[in-house]
Amino acid sequence: VELLAQRRLRRVLVVTSTPVLPQLGFLFEALNHAGCVIISSPPVDQEPTVAIFEGVLQKARDEAVEAVLGVGGGSALDVAKLTAALARGGQPVREVLGINLLQGRDLFLVCLPTTSGTGSEVSPNAILLDETDQMKKGVVSPHLVPDAAVVDLFLTLSVPPAVTAATGLDALTHCLD
């Protein structure tokens, strides 16, 4: 919240999933206290498709957001990262699928992970499911690396034990790679 206040960023899009939302009361209270207007995106409750992403992107554009706050697992964080990169630019998402095709990012971006598997909060990658061919496609660009990543232990408690176990094993396999 301090990072947003220091930069006088007031219109903040929060990208998260439905299960995480009840845990964010403290965060919303802090944002309100800092004078921020909280804009909630449509929830990212599954692997994000291009259509789900485009709905979030449209909300960001309609609300003229100044910053994006991603809270959740890899899916929510990937959507937050892409939204921050494409909200003010003219590039369509299908044009940036691939490596180093993203032209930049104008919005300040903070990610708060609730899981440990993907590392999305610090990576230059984002994954979307393309409904046209049912293939997962990636965007790889240094412009996707968030300005800040904040790990809050209490947010990890919002995740069901089975998801914690699965993402923990995912993190372990990444270490072994």
Which ranges hold each PLM region?
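General beta-strand structural signal in soluble alpha/beta enzymes
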Residues: T16, S40-P42, L69, V79, ...
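Glycine/serine-rich anion-binding loops at beta->alpha junctions
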Residues: V65-T83, T114-S120
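Predominant activation on well-ordered alpha-helical scaffold segments within soluble catalytic domains
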Residues: F28, I39, E54-L57, K81-A84, ...
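ATP/NTP phosphate-donor binding region
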Residues: V1-A67
